[in-house]
């Protein structure tokens, strides 16, 4: 977030002649894209022959986009039921006079009706829990989607009830370690606050 390009930052680091560079990314608002920047810096350092420990850009971009993260999670864990809503398609009939019936909108509402409530409605790109709303009924979600408040691509997901835990996986090139559980603190709405988590686990 310094305003320096990845190339200039990598050059500054390279001048220190490190044996290895380890990326440590902190959160940023409103967009938590620091990991993307550190991944770009790592690529530049690797071009200069400096070893790095950092996520690659593909993983960093996938983690930045909440829907891409959701798809990634679904490949190896049971994730909450959810749907991605493409803003332009959802409003297709308003911008295209030739569209008399918006089948995409019909599909979106059909899927939301199948969900268990409450659900969370969130922007696909915001940092942490910024902008996340809890909605308790189908009618509440329908009203939101048909209002002017719906102004970007969003996700609607079932809210998993109960205390929230997570973990971190550290490693490189196939050698990974799963760290002890993390107990997430939550906002008054019951949404995870990843910047205020407490780590603990078995001895």
Task: Tell me the role of every PLM-derived stretch.
Residues 1-53, 58, 91-95:
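ATP-binding N-terminal substructure of ATP-dependent carboxylate-amine bond-forming enzymes
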Residues 8-9, 107, 140:
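Short acidic active-site motifs
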Residues 13-18, 113-115, 149-150:
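Glycine-rich phosphate-binding loop signature in dinucleotide/nucleotide-binding domains
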Residues 21-22, 120, 155:
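Structural motif
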Residues 43-131:
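A conserved helix-loop-beta module that forms one wall/lid of the active-site cleft
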Residues 139, 158-203:
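ATP-dependent carboxylate/phosphate-activation module, predominantly the ATP-grasp catalytic core
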């Amino acid at each position: 977030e310094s305003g320096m390009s990845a190339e200039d930052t990598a050059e500054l680091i390279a001048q220190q002649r490190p044996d290895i560079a380890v990326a440590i990314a902190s959160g940023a608002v409103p967009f938590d894209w620091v990991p993307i920047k550190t991944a770009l810096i790592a690529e530049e350092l690797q071009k200069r022959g400096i070893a790095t420990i950092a996520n690659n850009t593909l993983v960093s971009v996938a983690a930045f986009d909440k829907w891409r993260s959701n798809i990634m999670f679904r490949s190896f864990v049971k994730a909450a039921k959810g749907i991605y809503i493409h803003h332009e398609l959802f409003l297709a009939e308003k911008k295209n006079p030739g569209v008399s019936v918006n089948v995409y909108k019909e599909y979106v509402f059909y899927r939301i009706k199948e969900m268990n409530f409450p659900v969370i409605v969130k922007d696909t790109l915001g940092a942490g829990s910024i902008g996340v709303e809890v909605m308790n009924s189908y009618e509440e979600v329908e009203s939101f989607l048909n209002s002017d408040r719906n102004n970007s691509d969003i996700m609607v997901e079932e809210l998993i009830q109960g205390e929230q835990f997570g973990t971190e996986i550290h490693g490189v090139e196939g050698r990974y370690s799963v760290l002890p559980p993390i107990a997430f603190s939550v906002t008054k709405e019951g949404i995870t606050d990843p910047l205020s988590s407490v780590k603990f686990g078995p001895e």
